Amino acid sequence: MTVPSPLAARRASSTLAAVKRPLRILLSLAGALAAVPLLYLLAALILAVIPANPGWHEARQGVRIFVRTNGVHTWIMVPKVSADMDWRPLVPGADLKDPRWGNGNYVALGYGNRQFYLNTATWADLTVRNAFWALVGSGDSLIHADHDNDPQPSDIQRPIVLSHDEYVRLVRFIRASFRTDARGRTIPLLGRGYGNSDVFYEAVGPYNAFYTCNSWTGQALRAAGVRTGVWTPLSDSIMWRLR
């Protein structure tokens, strides 16, 4: 029987160690990557529970808005005309595929990733590529304006009454999210809606996993002074407080 020489044994041991080291590094990286979604969800849960504006109470009289959700995305629904703001010049019915929808008295405004908005009309259109860009961000963002009439409270549409001062602050935040042209007009993507009642507008700001559509909604509510989580990347981060 041939006995391996000490030199051969040392070489084999050295080769095995050389293989194990990068393998350990790869396994450590894989473990770290696997932990990222869990840490994200944990942070989302904790920071949604910690309230901004903890002393806020809903106004008895004022402007009635709604926060709407489809389970993933949220919108803020505002009356088109009030003593404090007329939204019709910013989101006119003339921008819609069917301008008759512009006769409604409310408009739902939401913020989102450009690629995801334009290429994911329904969840059946969701692709890995669209989801990836929605998470990491692809630069441009859009405002989605969906015209409605006489919205009613429901599980997916929660009313909030704001004082006039609170509503003015909300309006200021939302208006600042619209990108405008040299004449101060909003910039619609004509013909690029999901149906006859909605249309997209160019928006200001980035979109990524840390500043999502729901983060925007939460920031808008915090700007108004409403009690909201300090970070609200998920729809449930917002809606659970409004039950």
State each model region's role.
Residues L7-A9, Y40, P54:
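A generic alpha-helix propensity feature with a strong bias for hydrophobic helices
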Residues P51-A52, W56-V63, V67-V72, M77-E202:
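Non-catalytic ligand/cofactor/substrate-binding and regulatory segments of enzyme domains
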Residues T2-P4, A35, V49:
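Selective for proline/serine-rich intrinsically disordered segments
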Residues S14-I46, A176-R243:
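Activation targets extended, charge/polar-rich intrinsically disordered C-terminal tails
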Residues R11-S13, D155-L162, R227-T232:
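Short, exposed beta-strand "edge-strand" segments with a Pro/Gly-rich flavor and a Y/T-containing core
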Residues M1-A17:
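Short, intrinsically disordered terminal tails adjacent to the first/last structured region
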Residues S5, A9, L118, T122-T127, ...:
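Charged/polar interaction segments and conserved charged motifs
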